[in-house]
From Swiss-Prot:
Organism: Phoneutria nigriventer (Brazilian armed spider)
Similarity comment text for this entry: Belongs to the tachykinin family.
Residues bearing the modification Pyrrolidone carboxylic acid: Q1
Descriptive protein name: Tachykinin-like peptide-V
Tissues showing expression: Expressed by the venom gland.
Amino acid sequence: QKKDKKDRF
């Protein structure tokens, strides 16, 4: 799980 702007994980 990489930290993306749309993803919190």
